Amino acid sequence: MPNVKLPTGADLHYEAFGAGEPVVLIPSTGFSGECWKPSQMPIADSCRLVLHDPRGCGRTTAPQKVYTINQMANDVVALLDHLGIAAAHIVGHSMGGRIGLEMTLNFPGRVKSLIMAASGSGLAPRPGADCVPGAPHWLVHSLAAHGFEQTLREEYTDTSAFFTDEWRAQNPEKVEEFYQHVIKTHARVSEYVHLVIARHSWEATHRLGDVLRPVLVLIGDNDSGRANHVVQAEALKNRIPGARMHVLKGQSHGFPWQAPEATNQVILDWVKAHA
């Protein structure tokens, strides 16, 4: 698919597959829409699947270097306008869930349902030194001490942050395939830092009671590292009216890629129930 120049100012790359209930997948910090292709494409067998590269990632360009969660939510709404989709099921992983939540709060009529996968509502419910606005200390230190590529390696392949230790030990080739696939269109260092700052400068915990659409909180029970998404998931479930939570056993932050079949089934069952 070609890029589309949106009224939000982004020249946004997207792809659409299949037919049926519209499902928009929003990726994590720095990832492009390509990240979903090894794992989530079966969703297109029964749904209209929409992938895109957020600002600063892949083949999308935007005129400014300062990004916000609000901007990226507006981009998704503008993409739906371009595609003629009145409302869609939004599935956001990590920062993608934050973008989806911002969209749900600001444009509830455009959201049929929201799945927040390994995500959160901002810094307020999170424990630890990672929870400060702007660029977190660990990122600044890692970039200075080890460089950009090693920082990404540590996050995605060399620790249990994304994949559990047992699965990494048993599937080193799959871990490396994942890294080589996503790094091709991953945000570069400048854009990545700006995206992290956007993520850490956003807060919606005080607005969770205003969510009007059905929400599923999807979390791996081992996703309790630096950002402790397990704690964040509990906060989402407890504060969003009517929210449901599904826990994937034996999974960490990267469960869409470590357990794609289970992840896809949860998504499809949820979409069917809220069509």
Language-model features: where?
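Flexible "cap/lid" loop of the alpha/beta hydrolase fold
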Residues: 105, 112-148
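Conserved alpha/beta-hydrolase catalytic His-Asp/Glu region
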Residues: 150-207
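Conserved HGGG/HGGXW glycine-rich cap/lid loop of the alpha/beta-hydrolase fold
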Residues: 6-62
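Conserved alpha/beta-hydrolase "acid-adjacent" motif
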Residues: 224-232
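Active-site loop/oxyanion-hole signature of alpha/beta-hydrolase fold enzymes
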Residues: 50-95
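Short beta-strand/loop motif that positions the catalytic acidic residue
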Residues: 211, 217-219
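Hydrolases whose catalytic domains are alpha/beta-hydrolase-1, hotdog thioesterase
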Residues: 99-103
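Catalytic active-site module of serine/aspartate enzymes centered on a nucleophile-bearing elbow/loop
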Residues: 242-275
